[in-house]
Amino acid sequence: MAQKLAFCSVRFNLEESLEQDREKKAAILEELLDFTRQNLPAMSRTMVCDLVEMVTANIFRPLPNIEKRSGPDPLEEEDEWLEPMWGHLSLAYTILLTILEHPHFEPNSLKTVVNKPFMEKLLELFFSADANERETLKTVLHRIYGNFLSLRRFTRVRVSELLLSVIHEGDQTNTKKQVISDVNKRC
């Protein structure tokens, strides 16, 4: 299991990675998702933390600068921009949601992983140009907000600061308007 988690913790670059490695990672992520769904109550606290750390290694990444991306704003068009690695990201988010939504989930088991720095990085992902990712993030944020009482005040303050920074920058691209709308619906 440790080898699978280590392999899936590596983020692949589309230009530099082999397709067979990307396919192998997707297969292992699906296997980890099935394992999580079937065995979460029996998993040790350490194993659950390791799973969430693998998820964070996948989802927390530098985002392309929205303003500097060439071409029109991705949210202006009907054809929305998709994150090239959405297949892997989607599976990683689903693993996280499976853990957060499980009836036997104990938030205390993840206090060392799901903390203020985690929330900072999670909120930054709302600037992703991929609407699928922002939609998934809304659900993740809602589950964390509901489960981690100790992070609620921090989350409200950071969301307020995020919204104010977007508003005060004066740049009202459709993407930023969408970020405001997405975050505002959840908090």
Located regions from the model:
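Alpha-helical solenoid scaffolds in large eukaryotic transport, assembly, and signaling factors
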Residues: 1-187
